């Protein structure tokens, strides 16, 4: 399950979302996009993602987690291939919006499926390992895109989209063959239950006042993460090329380092949350992100950019890892999908706002530095909200 989950995350976020930043400079030049239009394309993705956040629980109930994942990956593969054919800004916007729909279906269903297979003692670590697939996707695109661009010239970004779509299609087939909705489908028990039977499904329906209080606070934290990490992820390569004069190949190597460090993100912060508490895991992750944004926001030289990229990568998947574990701990595995969808709504709203706001600010100021500084302020707000969480039931 972990191996299959890595492959799903490699495709639905690592390639579908995080290759966009690498392809954006060449794509923008070919389609003559302003910074604002670049931001709107990124926002379109998250509008699609946001739509799927609302529909994912119903879709999973109707089709099951495995079928939802396969459907999502299929949509991603098709729309990424169409992006490679796009000749205008509106068509690129529509295609990438539907890529977001597919990403939402696959990501949310995969995260909920993990909670079905792993007991609380291993849930944070297992989720972290699965999310490491995002980092593999970043490394893959960080090396593939510059090489394809060098070999194919100005239109290399189109071939890159096609190749990435093919990789997602292969992942779609493999996920359909390997994944199962729960351990009982294979006559197994929940991993980490130490020989005990999987706990029976909770009989609770809906959420209590205490549950809603927790969900609101987690939602605010997830919103700050959504706004900030996507600004950095969307525009850092553009910043390196346009503001620091790096070549596409050099910027690609920078981006690949994000992927490398992010391989440790989920496992490290998942372990911290399993060992100490979910609260400590969230606060530590937000603190690392704050440092990364400040280093990018001030002109401190190339060494500071390297450190910023390393810190960003190290904390890249930390918040989703701990969030899912927290939700599953507090609400139970059978309400985890609904709870995760609710807080992911906050996350998706943040991702809708982030690229648009940063793109418009860059058009006004000619730089993304103010966006990185504002991102640091928002993650500090997230730390303050994290401090209000109780340590009840591992949080």
Regions found by a protein language model. Give the residues of each.
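Helix-to-loop junctions at the C-terminal end of transmembrane segments
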Residues: 52-64, 266-277, 363
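Helix-loop-helix hairpin linking two adjacent transmembrane segments in secondary transporters
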Residues: 129-181
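Extracytoplasmic gate region of multi-pass secondary transporters
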Residues: 20-21, 211-263
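C-terminal transmembrane helical hairpin of 12-TM major facilitator-type secondary transporters
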Residues: 262, 273-326
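C-terminal membrane-cytosol helix-exit motif in multi-pass small-molecule transporters
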Residues: 165-194, 385-389
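Cytoplasmic helix-loop-helix junction between adjacent transmembrane helices
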Residues: 96-132
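C-terminal ends and interior cores of transmembrane alpha-helices
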Residues: 74-87, 288-300
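Helix-breaking motifs and short loop linkers at transmembrane-helix boundaries and internal kinks
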Residues: 32, 64, 85-90, 245, ...
């Amino acid at each position: 399950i972990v191996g299959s989950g890595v492959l799903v995350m490699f495709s639905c976020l690592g390639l579908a979302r995080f290759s966009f930043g690498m392809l954006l400079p060449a794509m923008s030049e070919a389609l003559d996009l302003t910074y604002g239009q670049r931001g709107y394309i990124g926002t379109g993705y998250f509008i699609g993602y946001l739509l799927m956040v609302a529909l994912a629980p119903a879709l999973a109930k109707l089709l099951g987690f495995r079928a939802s994942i396969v459907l999502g990956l299929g949509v991603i593969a098709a729309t990424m291939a169409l992006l490679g054919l796009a000749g205008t800004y509106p068509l690129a916007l529509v295609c990438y919006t539907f890529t977001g729909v597919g990403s939402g279906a696959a990501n949310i269903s995969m995260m909920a499926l993990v909670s079905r297979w792993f007991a609380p003692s291993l849930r944070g670590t297992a989720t972290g390992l699965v999310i490491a697939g995002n980092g593999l996707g970043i490394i893959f695109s960080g090396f593939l895109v510059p090489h394809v661009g060098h070999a194919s010239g100005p239109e290399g970004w189109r071939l890159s989209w096609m190749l990435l779509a093919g990789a997602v299609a292969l992942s779609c087939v493999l996920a359909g063959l390997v994944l199962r909705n729960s351990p009982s489908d294979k006559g197994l028990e929940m991993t980490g239950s130490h020989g005990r039977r999987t706990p029976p499904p909770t009989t609770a329906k809906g959420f209590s006042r205490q549950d809603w209080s927790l969900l609101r606070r987690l939602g605010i934290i997830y919103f700050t993460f959504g706004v900030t990490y996507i600004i950095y992820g969307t525009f850092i390569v553009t910043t390196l090329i346009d503001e620091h004069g790096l070549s596409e190949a050099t910027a690609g190597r920078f981006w690949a380092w994000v992927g490398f460090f992010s391989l440790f993100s989920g496992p490290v912060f998942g372990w911290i949350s399993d060992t100490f508490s979910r609260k400590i895991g969230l606060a530590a992750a937000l603190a690392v992100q704050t440092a990364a944004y400040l280093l990018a926001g001030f002109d401190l030289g190339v060494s500071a950019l390297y450190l910023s990229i390393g810190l960003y990568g190290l904390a890249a998947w930390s918040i989703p890892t701990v969030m899912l574990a927290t939700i599953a701990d507090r609400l139970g595995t059978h309400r985890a999908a609904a709870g995760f969808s609710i807080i992911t709504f906050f996350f998706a709203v943040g991702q809708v706002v982030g690229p648009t706001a940063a793109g418009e600010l860059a058009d006004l100021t000619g730089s993304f530095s103010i966006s990185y500084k504002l991102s640091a302020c928002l993650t500090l707000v997230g730390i303050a909200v994290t401090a209000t969480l109780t340590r009840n039931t591992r949080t």
